[in-house]
Amino acid sequence: MIPTDSEYYTVVKFALDQCEQFDHYLEAWKVCEKKFWQYNWIHAYPNAAIEVIALYYCENSLDRCINMMSMMGQDVDCNAAQVATMFGAAYGIEAISEKWLKPLPEELLTYVRGHEKTSIADITSFTVECVNRALENR
């Protein structure tokens, strides 16, 4: 599905080739990390490699996949979201552990000065307020 003449294809193929050469996911990642060192931690290329590697080694377990992606680092939350979506589409909701399906607690503790203790509802309201103000001022 990925055009074979694209850069993205070469990244995915490189990661898959490493998976086929090594018995452990961290060995495959070490080679990919070295190859993609020049890219920022949120760049698509190292994160695509992480997703490929984790999916290859996780034995169809989302929990294992998320754990592996966390151990490799980079943009962990975005990688987990993309892979969880793939698991849900491919295997159904039954493939996703209940702990990932439960609602988050309302209270949030942060490192943001002045907002060390907040809530999802407060953040949601503030976001809507900002969007409405931006729309009014355009």
Stretches with model-predicted labels:
Residues 131, 135-138:
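Bulky hydrophobic segments
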Residues 1-73:
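Accessory "access/gating" subregions that flank catalytic or transport cores
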Residues 51-131:
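Catalytic phosphate/nucleotide-handling subdomain of diverse soluble enzymes
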